[in-house]
A protein has these predicted regions:
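Intrinsically disordered, low-complexity regulatory segments
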Residues: 1-168
Length: 168
């Protein structure tokens, strides 16, 4: 189970019985619960596509990446490595996206999922309340991650559009 932030992960973990603290996650009752700390990964800076773009020059515009790159922020690498290890652990059969319900939550989770090279089935916890009863009900009604592909694509398009407008 991967939440967007530690406080949410703690609430979810308490309800599902994952109360043993580990380095970067909680474990128990057959669950491992961790968090992303917001956007762990994002679109690469322009100089990742061409070192000449490290210094902004009008003559280089427009900068239009042919193949977009996602990168992990240097200050977030430790948590990313924890998530990658957890998602790809041999005993993990599926991964639950418990990031915030909405397009940004989809982008935050899937950026990490993709960069980690995870191929495990993905489920989605979609809740709008952090009440214990809402969390329990959400876990009883997990949906396929594929049901939210459109939201992910919308968030990714928004991120790319922001990048293009911001850089150009």
């Amino acid at each position: 189970v991967i939440a967007e932030k530690p406080s949410v992960a703690q609430s979810l973990a308490t309800v599902i019985g994952a109360t043993v603290r580990k380095d970067g996650y909680l474990e128990g009752n057959g669950w491992r619960v961790s968090w992303c700390v917001g956007h762990l990964a994002g679109l690469a800076d322009a100089d990742a596509y061409n070192p000449d773009y490290a210094k902004w020059r009008y003559d280089d515009l427009p900068i239009l990446p042919e193949h977009w790159q996602m990168v992990v922020g240097a200050d977030k690498k430790k948590q990313f490595d924890i998530l990658k290890k957890l998602m790809n652990a041999p005993d993990v059969t599926e991964v639950v996206n418990a990031c915030d319900a909405g397009r940004e939550g989809e982008l935050i989770f899937r950026s990490v999922y993709d960069l980690a090279g995870c191929q495990k089935p993905m489920k989605r916890l979609w809740i709008s309340s952090m009440e214990d009863s809402a969390i329990r009900e959400g876990f009883e009604h997990l949906r396929s991650g594929a049901d939210y592909d459109g939201l992910y694509q919308a968030a990714l398009c928004r991120a790319k559009a922001d990048w293009l407008v911001g850089i150009n």
